[in-house]
Amino acid sequence: SFEILKLYSIFKSGNKTKSIPQSYIPTQSFFDKIASFIRLNLFIPDSRIGWNYFAFKKAKKLIEDNNINCVITTGPPHSSHLIGKKIYEKFKLKWIVDLRDPWAELFYLKNKFQFNCVKKLNLKFELDVLNSADAIITTVGKRYQNIIKDKLSNTKNIHKIYNGYDKKAYDKIEEIKPDSYNIVFTGILSKNHNYHLFLEVLSLLKDKYKNLNMIFTFAGKIDKEIKNLFSEKIHFIDNGYVDHEKAIKIIKSSHLLINFNYLNTEDTDMVSGKLIEYLASGSPIINFSNSARESDIILKNSIKSFSADSNDV
């Protein structure tokens, strides 16, 4: 199937199989900006739309061969829900829509340029899906569920099911902590995140304690400017984008875990799967956020963890 991210990967690295995270839209170079513009304005709702024809063809065969009477579609990528809608219309079966993240309110769309007609088309796709589905599942809290309800033309079954983690796979990974106090962050860190407060905390610590034996271990994608800012404050170890098993190993090596909520996500109050995996490690967690009611509820499962905002410095 055709995906713009494959072309982007070939151009950047010469390898179309090199992974680019779903929620990561690089905009550092001129080519990045062009690719971002194309991705956000020509591929609606997302760059994975190119596989829909092939996915529907395969799904049709599976449904016919196995007498399937219920389908669950999960996103992002939200293009998968458009496959589900086509299946629903073709076979008249039960359809559950699983929103792992918001759709039209998706965090990385807020500070990116999209034509108004594109925004309207994306919203139309979402409304068509939500109003067709028999039930809706979200991983986020009551505030986002209210946003969904406002979009519905009739009452739907809306359920909240948090992300989870694979305990068996998690427990197989050995816990090895370094001698230095190890602060860990895994995932994507961009200018859309609430990281400035943590930089302020590190500055205060650096000024007050000159010989702190402390490191900041990072795994994932990070904006180059942000990486430089942290490198000035603390010994920064960048592991780059790693597979899930390596990410869990890094999480389990922590003395403290850091989570940065996305800016402008106060209404949706997202609870990531990463936060659940953080909790499973048993390490203390600081969640930096302006407003994280749902995250606060989750973090109450650990007496050593809390959410922090500018009033806590």
What are these regions (language model features)?
Residues D134, I251-D269, S283:
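Acidic donor-binding loop of glycosyltransferase active sites
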Residues I20, P26-S29, A55, A59-S80, ...:
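Short N-terminal targeting/anchoring amphipathic segment
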Residues Y209, N213-K249:
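Nucleotide-activated donor-binding/catalytic signature segment of Leloir-type glycosyltransferases, i.e.
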Residues S79-L82, K86-K90, W103-A104, N116-I136:
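Membrane-proximal helix-turn-helix segments that form the acceptor-binding/catalytic region
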Residues K142-R143, I161-G164:
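Carbohydrate-associated surface elements
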Residues I137, I176-H193, L199-L202:
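Conserved donor-binding/catalytic core segment of Leloir-type glycosyltransferases
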